[in-house]
Each structure stands twice: as structure tokens, then as C-alpha cells.
From Swiss-Prot:
Entry text on domains: The protein kinase domain is predicted to be catalytically inactive.
InterPro entries: ConA-like_dom_sf, Kinase-like_dom_sf, L-type_Lectin-RKs, Legume_lectin_dom, Prot_kinase_dom, Ser-Thr/Tyr_kinase_cat_dom
Protein name per its UniProtKB record: Probable inactive L-type lectin-domain containing receptor kinase III.1
Protein source organism: Arabidopsis thaliana
Gene expressing this chain: LECRK31
Positions on the Cytoplasmic side per record topology: 325-627
Disordered, as annotated region: 272-297
GO molecular-function terms, A-Z: ATP binding; carbohydrate binding; protein kinase activity
Segments in the Extracellular topological domain: 24-303
Membrane topology recorded in Swiss-Prot or TrEMBL: Single-pass type I membrane protein
Length: 627
């Protein structure tokens, strides 16, 4: 028998069921802060009691993500087209003690599972294997604060539209259009100040617009980015919407203060008074106001100040002359801003240079792994100088080396000197040297995507060292063992700027044998050979090969003349993922760099442009001459 109570319970259950279903199909929401919001947090992401969403803090190599609790239906069930949407959010990026990094992205993805994704430039969304894969079906709008040259970043403060990878299909320096002045005004993403973003997609016109402005400014009439694109192939099902941010060796805190989203309509506007506040910056101490000084005390205070100042001046002069005399005894001066470590600090960090800490030994010195602090791992290179002149020359270069900062170079933190030995303190790069990946079987086989990225990274590093309009810094020893790979397999060129040292057999330019002088041209020659080694997976000289294959350069040249350059490609590379156009580009560029005539070799800026596809290679006939 059906009772009133059973009917009531049924109605309550159906109401609850309908509310659950409708919440799962939610297509419009407005969040002033995220306390109690329908939000899923992953990684380092968290919500403050104030409602402020923090994706990452200033710790290194973090990934933080936050997604709306239920997927959003972005495909039109009545047609093959996707639906229109509009969203707006307010974010802020505050940098740590160093440079800001790496940025955040608004993400639309079919999945919230990003296991295997890399931090830093990959924003916690992709890795080197799946970057650019059309099966990802991911749209991301990136707000990038670190320039990755190998990913075609235009600068270290830009906004980009990313489709299935972190190489933007459209990007622009961060700015907003000022309607009163009728011009774009630059906007610093990592200023620590709130920035509002509007992202709108019109499915009918297949147009995606991205607009941004400071929080206290109205929405500009002209977007920063407008891209005509049909997203129906991407939004073929329900997708998750949210945010992803990451840090690398440089770090920032990434915050989101509010978020509005709507399908087939305009996003709701914010009430700025309801937004959570950002954390206070570290307090700066200001001196307390001095109490008034009586007239009677002024003369006594003045005399006291004179006496103290005179005493301090005398003491300072004594200290300066004592230090000068002490340094004169050794006739070696450490100049500039390079950090000097005590020998005890370096010894403690490496366990007294214990053999268990030994990373490797080369002609140029021995490398040790060390730990300065729980989170600061270092690599220490010990160089024993045979003459005073050698030590003086090396020390003179330390200051110049320490000032060089580029993401594809291994950073020099500082140095230590004791007796005949110099200890160079570098950042630790975890995956070791490139030669172990190319020539040994104890490491995974590098994919073609990895290799091409590594080649472009080395090119960017050499271009930076060689410089433009300034005195170049010659590497002098470009080879696979001097290229280190970080956690994301990015190339980090090391062992640069330490005197004139010749490359190993096979990498030595012909003129170097006669003159003994390293130049930009000899670096270019060595890099050309290294490019071929990376593609072919073998060393420049292999005496056990057939006579026509002993020299890698000659072997590649034979393939070029036969019209079959791909024959020399490393057979371990998965052919399904091989991009023949890129392989040919690298091998031809390598032959051009390995020209026997230094005048015929390109400069590194041209080499980099060849690899980026922004400058065409010379005609093929030109490559035959002089190789």
C-alpha cells in the first residue's frame, strides 16, 4: 500500500537525484574565491581559508592543478560543431628570490590525469614524448614567465594559445589595449598584482579571443590574441576545465582569486569586494623615528660622530691594506661577483671528496656530487693547475662565467681555491651526460623528438656564448660528454669558458691543428659533428667500422650524395615517430657546419635559425664544397 510517507520519500529522492544530475551537467558558475567551491585540487594546489587558490608556492619543480568538479559538455549533441563558451578569471604570480617561473595555464582537457607530465616549461601538462600529439585533445591558454627557446617562446612574459602541446600556435607579449590612449600597454605577468583574463570562443564564427587587463581596468575593446580555429575536433566530448601551473629551477607562487564560466553565454561579472586578498609581501623594516635631540646635546653628539667616523675610517684602511698585502703574497686576485666558497664547505658537501661521490673523471678534471643544503644539490669540478699562469688565467675567467645565465647552460654558482687546485661549484644536472644516452646501453633510447629538442638547446646555448656585439666566449670543447640532460631531457651545455682547450678527435676543426687557436668557427665545426652524432647514435670516429664508415662526416656525406641521408640515422629510433624533414634539416646543417673552410661555416645565430625554420639553408650544391 502506497502511503503518504513513501510518496514523500520518493519525491525527496527524485529531487536529490535531479539535483545531482543537474550539478554534474553544470554549465555556468561564478566563484569569488574557492572556499567550498566545486573544485578538485591536485599536486601542490590548495585553497587558503580566505578562499584564495594557490597552485604552486616558491618550491622548485612543482606541479599544481585545480579543475572544476564535473566535466563540461563542450560538444553539440545536435551537430558536429562544438559549443561556444566564455570564461574569466583573476590570477596573480609572485616570484621568489630569483627569476619568476614558469607560469600557469587555463586548461580544457578530456582527462585530469597528467601522470608523466613534466614541470617547468611543460606546465604540468605534457612531456617530451606527447608534446604536440593530436590525440591529447587539449586546449591551453598559457601565461608564460620563462623563455624556452627550443619551444619557440617569443620572450619571458607572454600569452600563448596552445593546442595539444606547449609550442604556441599564436602568442604575444603580455599587454592590454588602453581604449583611452588607443594603444597596447605592456603588462608584467609576475608583478605580484592581480590580472584579469577573458577567454571567449564563438563556435559559429570559429573565433577564439584572449583578453587581459589589470584588475582595476575595464575589459579592453580589442583582445590581445584572436585566432580563427575550429575546436570541434578537440571538443568531441565532455571536457574538464581548470588551471595548471608549474615551477622548475626557478619558482613562483601562482594564485587564482576568482573564476567565472558559462556555456553559450557571457560569463558572470565579479564583485571585486568579494575576492580574497593575496598574501602580504615580506615585511620591510623601516627605521623608527628618532626622538628630538636637545640643543645642549647636539654639540656632544657631533663630536662623538666625528670620533667614531674617524676611527672607523682608520680601521677600514688598515683592513684594506692588510687584505691587499695578503692577496699580493699569492699575486692572484678574485674579482667581480662570483661567489667564493670555503674549502671546508666544499669538502663537507662532497664527503671529503669521497669516491662514492665521484661523478666522473676527464682530462679537464674530476667531478663530484655534493649537497650544500637539504634541497641544494651541487656538482663540484676539481681542477689541478700545473702552473701559476694556468691558475691565474682560469681565475680571471671565473667572474665572466658566473655572470652568464641562459637556460641551456649549466650555471656556475661559485668557486673555491686551495693550493694548486681550483674547485668550480655548478648546479647539479640529474640525468648526466648526453654521451651515455647515445653511445652506452645503460640508458633509455632517446626519441627523435628528444634529440631534436636537445640539438636546438645546444644551438641556443652556443649562440648565447658567442654573443652579438660583444666579446664572444668560446667553448673550445663542444662534445656529447659536455652536454648534460636535466629531468625533462633538456640540453644543458657545460664545461665552457675555462681556457683554450681542444676538442676530442673527430671534433677538431682542420685549422685548429695548424693554429692551436679556438674560435667561434672551431666551435661551429665541433657542433656540426655533434649534431651528426646525435642523429646517427655513433661517435665521430670509429676505427672498427668499414673504411668508408670510419669517419662519421664522410659517411653522412656519402649518404647525401646518394640521395639517402636517412640511411645514417640511428636504427634504434622508432621509425613511426621519426620526422624525416627534421632529420634531413639537422644532417644538412651539420654538413654545412663541418665545412673544412672556416669562412664557409655559418655563424651560430644562422645555425639556430636554420633549425628553427626561420631561415632557409643554402642550396644543396653548396653543401658538397669543402666538406
Amino acid at each position: 500500500m502506497i502511503t503518504f510517507k513513501s510518496i514523500a520519500l520518493t519525491i525527496i529522492f527524485l529531487s536529490y537525484f535531479v539535483s545531482c544530475v543537474s550539478s554534474q551537467r553544470e554549465t555556468k558558475f561564478l566563484n569569488h574565491g574557492f572556499l567550498g567551491a566545486n573544485l578538485l585540487n591536485f599536486g601542490s594546489s590548495k585553497v587558503y581559508p580566505s578562499g584564495l587558490l594557490e597552485l604552486t608556492n616558491t618550491s622548485m619543480r612543482q606541479i599544481g592543478q585545480a579543475f572544476h568538479g564535473f566535466p563540461i559538455p563542450l560538444s553539440n549533441p545536435n551537430s558536429t560543431n562544438s559549443v561556444s563558451f566564455s570564461t574569466s578569471f583573476i590570477f596573480a604570480i609572485t616570484q621568489g628570490t630569483g627569476a619568476p617561473g614558469h607560469g600557469l595555464a587555463f586548461v580544457i582537457s578530456p582527462s585530469m590525469d597528467f601522470s608523466g607530465a613534466f614541470p617547468s616549461n611543460y606546465l604540468g601538462l605534457f612531456n617530451t614524448s606527447n608534446n604536440g600529439n593530436s590525440l591529447n585533445r587539449i586546449l591551453a591558454i598559457e601565461f608564460d614567465t620563462v623563455q624556452a627557446v627550443e619551444l619557440n617562446d617569443i620572450d619571458d612574459n607572454h600569452v600563448g594559445i596552445d593546442l595539444n602541446g606547449v609550442i604556441s600556435i599564436a602568442s604575444a607579449p603580455a599587454a592590454y589595449f588602453d581604449d583611452r590612449e588607443a594603444k597596447n600597454i605592456s603588462l608584467r605577468l609576475a608583478s605580484g598584482k592581480p590580472v584579469r583574463v577573458w577567454i571567449e570562443y564563438n563556435a559559429t564564427e570559429t573565433m577564439l579571443n584572449v583578453t587581459l587587463a589589470p584588475l582595476d581596468r575595464p575589459k579592453p575593446s580589442i583582445p590581445l590574441l584572436s585566432r580563427k580555429m575550429n575546436l570541434s575536433g578537440i571538443f568531441s566530448q565532455e571536457h574538464h576545465v581548470g588551471f595548471s601551473a608549474s615551477t622548475g629551477t626557478v619558482a613562483s607562487s601562482h594564485f587564482v582569486l576568482g573564476w567565472s564560466f558559462n556555456i553559450e553565454g557571457k560569463e558572470s561579472d565579479f564583485d571585486i569586494t568579494k575576492l580574497p586578498s593575496l598574501p602580504d609581501p615580506p615585511p620591510t623594516l623601516s627605521p623608527s623615528p628618532s626622538p628630538p635631540v636637545s640643543t645642549e646635546k647636539k654639540s656632544n653628539n657631533t663630536m662623538l660622530i666625528i670620533i667614531v667616523a674617524a676611527s672607523a675610517t682608520v680601521a677600514l684602511m688598515i683592513l684594506i691594506f692588510s687584505g691587499f698585502w695578503f692577496l699580493r703574497r699569492d699575486k692572484i686576485f678574485f674579482i667581480g661577483g662570483a661567489r667564493k666558497f670555503s674549502y671546508q664547505t666544499i669538502s663537507n658537501a662532497t664527503g671529503g671528496f669521497d669516491n662514492s661521490k665521484l661523478l666522473g673523471e676527464r682530462n679537464s678534471g674530476s667531478f663530484y656530487k655534493g649537497q650544500l643544503a637539504p634541497t641544494e644539490i651541487i656538482a663540484v669540478k676539481k681542477i689541478t693547475c700545473t702552473t701559476r699562469q694556468q691558475k691565474t688565467t682560469l681565475i680571471a675567467e671565473i667572474d665572466a662565467i658566473s655572470k652568464i645565465k641562459q637556460r641551456n647552460l649549466v650555471n656556475l654558482h661559485g668557486y673555491c681555491s686551495k693550493g694548486k687546485d681550483i674547485y668550480l661549484v655548478y648546479e647539479y644536472v640529474p640525468n648526466g651526460s648526453l654521451d651515455r644516452f647515445l653511445f652506452n646501453n645503460d640508458r633509455p633510447v632517446l626519441t627523435w623528438s628528444d634529440r631534436f629538442c636537445i640539438i636546438k638547446g645546444i644551438a641556443a646555448a652556443l649562440q648565447h656564448l658567442h654573443g652579438e656585439g660583444q666579446k664572444p666566449l668560446i667553448h673550445g670543447n663542444v662534445k656529447a660528454s659536455n652536454v648534460l640532460l636535466d629531468e625533462e631531457l633538456n640540453a644543458r651545455l657545460g664545461d665552457y669558458g675555462q681556457g683554450s682547450r681542444h676538442s676530442t678527435t673527430g671534433h677538431v676543426a682542420p685549422e685548429l691543428v695548424n693554429t692551436g687557436k679556438v674560435t667561434r668557427d672551431t666551435d661551429v665545426f665541433a657542433f656540426g659533428v655533434l649534431m651528426m652524432e646525435i642523429v646517427c647514435g655513433r661517435k665521430a670516429i670509429e676505427p672498427t667500422k668499414a673504411p668508408e664508415e670510419i669517419s662519421l662526416v664522410n659517411w653522412v656525406l656519402q649518404g647525401f650524395k646518394k640521395g639517402d641521408l636517412l640511411m645514417s640515422c640511428d636504427t634504434r629510433i622508432n621509425r613511426e615517430n621519426l620526422v624525416a624533414r627534421e632529420v634531413l634539416l639537422v644532417l644538412k646543417t651539420g654538413l654545412l657546419c663541418a665545412n673544412r673552410s672556416p669562412e664557409s661555416r655559418p655563424m651560430m645565430k644562422n645555425v639556430f635559425r636554420y633549425l628553427e625554420g626561420t631561415e632557409a639553408l643554402p642550396h644543396d650544391d653548396y653543401l658538397f664544397y669543402g666538406v
